[in-house]
Amino acid sequence: MAITALYEETRKLQSLHNAEVVMCSVPGDPPFLKYAWFKNDNYILDLESVLKRCGHLNHLLLHIPDYRVNRLVEWLSASQALLKNIEELHLNVLAFNIDLMQGQNVTGLEQFGSVTCTTAHQAYSNLTTREAVGVATHSLLICKGAEFYSPTGYEDKEQLLVVSPDAHPFKELVLQQIARELPGLRIQVIAGLTYDEFASLIRRAKWSLTFGEGLDGFFVEPVFSGSISFAVFNERFFTPAFADLETVYPSWDILLERIVEDIRRLDEPMAYNQGWQQAYDLLSQHLDTNRFRENLRSFYRGEYTFP
C-alpha cells in the first residue's frame, strides 16, 4: 500500500513535477493488472510497453523497490535501445525495509543515470544510510496517518489477539504460552484476508502482536484502530522513544516472560486506555501524513535530506 500512496500523492503534484504518472510492475515479475486485496482504481502497466509507447522522453523517473534493485540493473543493461529515447534518467530506490537493501547494487544504477534513495522509516533516515547506499538520500517517511482511522474503545473490543503472519523462531513458543495461560483469548494469525477484512478485524481486536520488523502495519494499524499492540524493540525500525512504551519489549525472552501478565493487567478500561493512548500519541507524532506530503514535494524539487 505504500507504493499506492506514493503513486496517488505523486499524481496530485503534477503541477510541481509536470509529468505523467503511471504504476508499473517490476520487469521480470509475473504480470498483474491491479492490487486485488484492497479497494483501488489503479491499474498496473508493463514498463517496457509504456516506454515503447512513449517514444522520446525529456525526463524519466523510475521508483524502484528496495528488493528489486539488482533486477533493474540487469533489465536496464539489456534495454539500451529503450534508454536511447530518454534524455535524462533518474532512478530512485525506495528503501521501505532497510534489511532488504543488503546485497542490492544501488551504485550499479549510476551507469544509467542519476540515482537517489528515499527512506520510509525515521530510524534509518540518517547519514549512516546515506554513506551505506552511496547516493543522495531523502527522508520520505511514507505513511497513512491516524486521521484515516476510527478507533474503537475498550467496551467495543473482543477478546481477540491478532498476530502478524511473519515467521519467527519464538512464534510457536509465544503463542503456545498465551493460548495455555489465557484460554478465553482467541488468537488469529493474519492470513488470506482482504484489507477491508483486516481493517474490520483489528477494529474488533483488543490486542495485536507482530513478529515482523516491529514498526510495521501489524503494530501501527491496530493502535490507530483502538487496539494495544505488542512488539520487540528493533533499533533498525523503531526510534528510541518507542522503547519507553510498556508493550514494546527489549527482547523476545522478556516478551515471553511478561506478555501474559501484561495482557491480564491491561485488560480493564482505565489501564487499557492509558496503555493505548501512550502508543497512539507517539505513533500520531511519528507518522504524519502532512509531513510525508511535504517530504514528497521536497523530493520532486530536488531538495534532499542527505545530498
Where are the regions a protein language model picked out?
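N-terminal subdomain of nucleotide-sugar transferases
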Residues: 1-26
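A short, active-site helix/loop in glycosyltransferases that binds the activated sugar's phosphate group
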Residues: 100-108, 113-135
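Acidic donor-binding loop of glycosyltransferase active sites
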Residues: 203-213
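Conserved catalytic-core segment of nucleotide-activated headgroup transferases in glycan assembly
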Residues: 2-11, 131-198
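Catalytic binding pocket for nucleotide-activated donors in carbohydrate/polymer assembly enzymes
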Residues: 217-287
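Short beta-strand->alpha-helix junction loop in the catalytic core
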Residues: 27-29, 97-99, 124-125, 134-150, ...
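Extended catalytic core of nucleotide-activated donor transferases of GT-like folds
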Residues: 30-113
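Short acidic alpha-helix that forms the nucleotide-activated donor recognition element
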Residues: 53-57, 194-204, 224
